[in-house]
Amino acid sequence: MSAQPIYKRVLLKASGEALMGSQGFGIDVAVADRIASDIAQARAMGVEVGVVVGGGNIFRGVAVASKGGDRVTGDHMGMLATVINALALATSLRKLDIDTVVLSAIAMPEICESFSQRATLYHLSLGRVVIFAGGTGNPFFTTDSAAALRAAEMGAEAIFKGTQVDGIYSADPKKDPSATRFDRLTHSEVLEKGLAVMDVAAVALARENAIPIVVFSIHEKDGFTEILTGGGRATIVTDS
């Protein structure tokens, strides 16, 4: 790819639902391999990549709470689901000979390294893809919030939020054909309009740290790398 990237260090947020593909549950290895291929292309362009994966394809803590269960326990189960997804994506990356490390917010030394900013920056300096697992390590915080937090800690120039659609819309375009697509928004506009991009805490944290959010379709092959070079189709959230 001849075009030069406009970002040198980014955080990719991929939902657990994206990893399950057309399946109703679990991990579609072909999808994990495709996402890994996009990340590998970004690395070939010299872009440093951190990744946060959700766990909704396996478990959601809020589902427990909605049925009368303990939200804290449910969130802990959801955090463990993100570790499974992180290991799956790491496996797909290693099949492509991409040096990858999984850092977990929950200590589990026999499975992966524990998260710290120092470890993150060290692994990035060695050219490794860093996958962050375990969310923030705290209940009541989403993996979107974890993405914004890790992006700030690693000094990311942008958060790339891979979604089911090609940007931010005024409503769910799959349910409302009249939904309007936005090409560009500010963080404040996202919050004021109540747009379902990331949760309020995540958008606010990104705004406070002047980190743009790039929303694109995770299902578009090469979409991630095209946007890295200024092409592709996405909505950019920035105050600059």
Curated annotation (Swiss-Prot):
GO terms for cellular component: cytosol. InterPro entries: AceGlu_kinase-like_sf, Asp/Glu/Uridylate_kinase, Uridylate_kinase, Uridylate_kinase_bac. Its EC number is 2.7.4.22. Catalyzes the reversible phosphorylation of UMP to UDP. It is found in: Cytoplasm. Residues 21-26 are annotated as: Involved in allosteric activation by GTP. Keywords: Allosteric enzyme, ATP-binding, Cytoplasm, Kinase, Nucleotide-binding, Pyrimidine biosynthesis, Transferase. One of its GO terms (biological process) is UDP biosynthetic process. This is Uridylate kinase. Belongs to the UMP kinase family. Homohexamer. It is an enzyme of class 2 (transferase). Pfam families: AA_kinase. ATP binds at K13, A14, S15, G16, G56, R60, T163, Q164, Y169, D172. GO terms for molecular function: ATP binding; UMP kinase activity. It catalyses: UMP + ATP = UDP + ADP. The lineage of its organism: Bacteria, Pseudomonadati, Pseudomonadota, Alphaproteobacteria, Hyphomicrobiales. UMP binds at G55, D75, T136, G137, N138, P139, F140, F141, T142, T143. Allosterically activated by GTP. Inhibited by UTP. It comes from Sinorhizobium medicae (strain WSM419). Pathway: Pyrimidine metabolism; CTP biosynthesis via de novo pathway; UDP from UMP (UMPK route): step 1/1. PANTHER family: URIDYLATE KINASE, URIDYLATE KINASE PUMPKIN, CHLOROPLASTIC.
